[in-house]
Structures are given as structure tokens and as C-alpha cells.
């Protein structure tokens, strides 16, 4: 018989830098999960993605065990990394902060593809382009 699920926790953590401090500790503590066990496992699995923010979905079972699924980094984080930005524009319709080429856009879309509900690479590229525009990044044709 399958284990009974008692909770789902969604967090966005720095790759390889999960610690028992907030937000990890309180989120897992209220479900009775071994916090250090999660931190060690998460850090081991994300060590090669240093510098990225990794969304993680933690499933907590009745016997206080857990499993987790790593997602791809948010599109905004990938865009900022690709063009070397610190942050997006405060007023994206007026202030432009960078340019993204079609090749860079395609690379980001391919990275995000498993987590997007897009049927094709072209539609994934349009989704990423929309995110870029809302950050004040222009897309070169």
C-alpha cells in the first residue's frame, strides 16, 4: 500500500545552500520532517547548479518521511544570468535594461521546457520572451 501524504511544501532555495534557518526550518518543522536530512540531500543534488534559485516541491508522508522534486530555475533568474543583470527594470515599459538574442532565448526555453506547459519550443520561447519583456529586457528579432 502506498504511503499516505500529509503535506506538500513548495520552496524556492539557493542551489547547494539550504540551511535549517528560515524559510526551510519552519516550513519543514511544522510537518515534523528531519530538517537536516532534507538540507543535506537537497544540497547534494543541487551542488552542480550553484548560483541559481531552485524551486522544490517536498511531499511529506504520514510516517514523517519525505520525497522532493526539483524544478528548473524560474525564467526570470535564467534571463538575468544569461545577460548578466543584477535585477530587472522597475518600469519595464520605459526603462530597458538589456537585450536578449534569439539564440539566448532558445537556450533558456530549452532549459525550462520540462516545467512549461508548452506544446512546442516556439511557444516556450514566446512564454520566455513575455517574461523578459515584463523585466524590461528587449528581444532581438
Swiss-Prot record:
The keyword rRNA-binding applies. PROSITE patterns: RIBOSOMAL_L11. One or more lysine residues are methylated. SMART domains: RL11. One of its GO terms (cellular component) is cytosolic large ribosomal subunit. The keyword DNA damage does not apply. It comes from the Bacteria. Keywords: Methylation, Ribonucleoprotein, Ribosomal protein, RNA-binding, rRNA-binding. InterPro entries: Ribosomal_uL11 (IPR000911), Ribosomal_uL11_bac-typ (IPR006519), Ribosomal_uL11_C (IPR020783), Ribosomal_uL11_C_sf (IPR036769), Ribosomal_uL11_N (IPR020784), Ribosomal_uL11_N_sf (IPR036796). CDD domains: Ribosomal_L11. One of its GO terms (biological process) is translation. Disulfide bonds: none annotated. One of its GO terms (molecular function) is structural constituent of ribosome. Pfam families: Ribosomal_L11, Ribosomal_L11_N. Belongs to the universal ribosomal protein uL11 family. NCBIfam families: L11_bact. Forms part of the ribosomal stalk which helps the ribosome interact with GTP-bound translation factors. Part of the ribosomal stalk of the 50S ribosomal subunit. Interacts with L10 and the large rRNA to form the base of the stalk. L10 forms an elongated spine to which L12 dimers bind in a sequential fashion forming a multimeric L10(L12)X complex. This is Large ribosomal subunit protein uL11. The lineage of its organism: Bacteria, Bacillati, Bacillota, Clostridia, Eubacteriales. The gene is rplK.
